[in-house]
Amino acid sequence: LEQEVKNLDFAAQDFLTVNMGATAIGTGITAEPEYAEMCIEALCKITGLDIKLADDLIGATSDTSCMVGYSAAMKRVAVKMNKICNDLRLLASGPRCGLGEINLPAMQPGSSIMPGKVNPVIPEVMNQVAYKVIGNDLCVTMSGEAAQMELNAMEPVMAQCCFESADLLMN
């Protein structure tokens, strides 16, 4: 998982390039010439981050690859966590048949017809989290390709999916 965390950090760097002052389609028309510089300066001061203005404001307005990339990095974490949880479920299968290589702590009552059975509820919950993150990534991917010309009207659902996935993975 250490490599996946590094991938998340790397993907997050794309969010430091913004299109402030680009206006609706990235031309900057009707915006005060100093607006972008003032915004960048204020954002850097407020966040303490090294935020930069995009070189191509038109491209930055329609391109949502920063969200697509970050969502994909979160999906990689989810896929790896899912595999680990599947391994835990298999290794903990038992007690009379199955591998029974490890014993997971009982988090709830087991089966009434199989005494001693411990349901792998924590790995199962993590499987469900992974499936949701993977589904959110599909939504972000499809929304990213839904841009038409200079504008992507799908950014709200992309942001919602990214925030939800981040929240699920952190908790």
Protein language model features and the residues they cover:
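Conserved, well-structured ligand/cofactor-binding cores
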Residues: 2-171
